[in-house]
């Protein structure tokens, strides 16, 4: 677990909660329940709306204990997302490691579209960027138990999924050498 200065922006999207949608929305446009919505474009080079709004706002501290912390975020009336949801996140640390638990509650009587993701970031204790961080990470190992991964197009928008293989196969605790993560 890497601490950050609470008064500075968290680098590299580290640990961001991605809601009410993860990834990207093409041109910031979507339709839900017969209505069309327009969100601000904030990823200009890809003309998309990126990673939702939850990471952009302060979260309320609900509970702080030695072994865990619980935070909540209630969506304000946001351009392109006029829905009222609350997300609660609990981060608990024990002898088995870190457990993250998230719940979402719709505070309104109308349906609310939402999706969820997290933006994990692996830190090797060094503060390099670009090719230097790639070189520092290559001897590290990562084990991830999954059978498929999401495929993306040139704008990093999801196009489907396929079985893990080659650089995407992390089931046997390989080094990250040549994987470019």
Over which residues does each language-model region extend?
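Well-ordered beta-strand positions
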Residues: 31, 62-63, 92, 105, ...
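Acidic, contiguous internal or C-terminal segments within carbohydrate-active enzymes
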Residues: 75-122
């Amino acid at each position: 677990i890497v601490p950050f200065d609470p008064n500075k922006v968290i680098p590299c999207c580290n640990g961001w909660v991605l809601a009410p949608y993860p990834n990207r929305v093409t041109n910031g446009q979507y339709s839900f329940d017969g209505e069309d919505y327009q969100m601000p474009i904030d990823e200009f080079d890809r003309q998309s709306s990126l990673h939702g709004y939850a990471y952009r706002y302060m979260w309320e501290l609900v509970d702080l204990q030695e072994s865990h912390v619980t935070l909540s975020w209630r969506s304000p009336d946001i351009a392109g997302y006029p829905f009222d949801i609350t997300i609660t996140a609990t981060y608990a640390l024990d002898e088995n490691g870190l457990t993250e638990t998230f719940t979402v509650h719709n505070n309104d009587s109308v349906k609310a579209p939402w999706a969820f993701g997290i933006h994990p970031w692996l830190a090797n204790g060094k503060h390099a960027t670009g090719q230097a961080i790639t070189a520092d990470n290559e001897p590290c190992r990562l084990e991830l138990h999954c059978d498929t991964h999401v495929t993306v197009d040139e704008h990093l928008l999801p196009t489907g999924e396929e079985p893990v293989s080659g650089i995407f196969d992390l089931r046997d605790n390989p080094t990250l050498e040549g994987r470019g993560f």
